[in-house]
Amino acid sequence: MRIILLGAPGAGKGTQAQFIMEKYGIPQISTGDMLRAAVKAGTELGKQAKEIMDAGKLVTDELVIALVKERIAQDDCRNGFLLDGFPRTIPQADAMKDVGINVDYVIEFAVPDELIIDRIVGRRVHAASGRVYHVKFNPPKVEGKDDVTGEDLTIRKDDHEDTVRKRLVEYHQQTAPLVSYYQKEADAGNTRYFKVEGTRKVEEVRAELETILG
């Protein structure tokens, strides 16, 4: 079961990815984690990636694809994998296909931008424990304070409204075209494409995913 999750940041992919991993026993492959692991392990590809990153440059698509290919050949991917945050662009999707990385399911999480902004900008975090609150959807007992320790809650740098809006613009320019790309792939019988309304309750989205994935 090889799955790609598509959707803007804050569309709820992370929550559902956790559920899919646990239910179906497949690992989530995040390109960021994968790059860090390869650099730490000192593999040939990891050394190349480190050189590029140390120079302050972006790692090339070719190198990321090679890392993905190496990663999915590992034992824990025998039953499949879940790709998170990759591919981000059509050239990356094409490159994946060219090296024989096929996917069974592409699931798009559809959520309007304004709701995403609402979701992300309202987040508050207790840095020491990682506990996450939301001023509207999951408020702490005392405003601005962690329920357990009473310590101050903070706003992550990425959760400021101007940053979120920039990320959404980037998503619509770069990643949204993958929606029509994978719809065409599904029409050609190369994958199965599903659109999930991410505005609903977590449990409702989860139930739909179970129906889709079986």
From Swiss-Prot:
Chain residue ranges for the region called LID: 122-159
Sites where the protein binds AMP: 31, 36, 57-59, 85-88, 92, 156, 167
UniProt subcellular location: Cytoplasm
Gene Ontology MF terms in the entry: adenylate kinase activity; ATP binding
Keywords from the UniProt entry: ATP-binding, Cytoplasm, Kinase, Nucleotide biosynthesis, Nucleotide-binding, Transferase
Reactions catalysed, as given in the entry: AMP + ATP = 2 ADP
GO CC annotations on file: cytoplasm
GO biological process: AMP salvage
Transmembrane regions listed in the UniProt entry: none
Binding site for ATP: 10-15, 123, 132-133, 200
Keyword check for Kinase: yes
Gene3D superfamilies named among the record's database cross-references: P-loop containing nucleotide triphosphate hydrolases
CDD domains from the UniProt entry: ADK
InterPro entries: Adenyl_kin_sub (IPR006259), Adenylat/UMP-CMP_kin (IPR000850), Adenylat_kinase_CS (IPR033690), Adenylate_kinase_lid-dom (IPR007862), P-loop_NTPase (IPR027417)
Pathway(s) annotated for this protein in UniProt: Purine metabolism; AMP biosynthesis via salvage pathway; AMP from ADP: step 1/1
Region (NMP) location: 30-59
EC number: 2.7.4.3
Quaternary state and interactors: Monomer.
Domain writeup: Consists of three domains, a large central CORE domain and two small peripheral domains, NMPbind and LID, which undergo movements during catalysis. The LID domain closes over the site of phosphoryl transfer upon ATP binding. Assembling and dissambling the active center during each catalytic cycle provides an effective means to prevent ATP hydrolysis.
Similarity field: Belongs to the adenylate kinase family.
Function: Catalyzes the reversible transfer of the terminal phosphate group between ATP and AMP. Plays an important role in cellular energy homeostasis and in adenine nucleotide metabolism.
Protein name stated in the entry: Adenylate kinase
Provenance organism: Pectobacterium carotovorum subsp. carotovorum (strain PC1)
Gene behind this protein: adk
